[in-house]
C-alpha cells in the first residue's frame, strides 16, 4: 500500500525506481518490518545482522544525498520521519 503510493508519487516526479530517494524509502520499509519482527523474536541473530547491514546502506545513501542535494535530503527525511545523520 505505502510502497505503491510512493511509486506513484515518484512517477509523477518522473524519477526512476533506482533513484536514491526510492532506495532509501525501500530500505526504510525493510527496517521497519525487521524491527517489528525482532520485537517478537529477540534471539534471531541473522535478522539482527541483516538489519544492521540495511541500516548501513541507508546511512551511506543518506550521506550521499545530503552532500549532493541538501533540499531533497531534508524533504525525504521529513517525509519518512527519520532522524538526520550525525555529523562528525
UniProtKB/Swiss-Prot annotation:
Source organism, top-level taxon: Eukaryota
Matches recorded under SUPFAM superfamilies: S15/NS1 RNA-binding domain
GO terms (BP aspect): translation
GO cellular component terms, A-Z: chloroplast; ribonucleoprotein complex; ribosome
Pfam family, any one: Ribosomal_S15
Main location (coarse class): plastid
Compartments, record wording: Plastid, Chloroplast
GO terms for MF: structural constituent of ribosome
Family per similarity comment: Belongs to the universal ribosomal protein uS15 family.
Subunit structure: Part of the 30S ribosomal subunit.
Protein name: Small ribosomal subunit protein uS15c
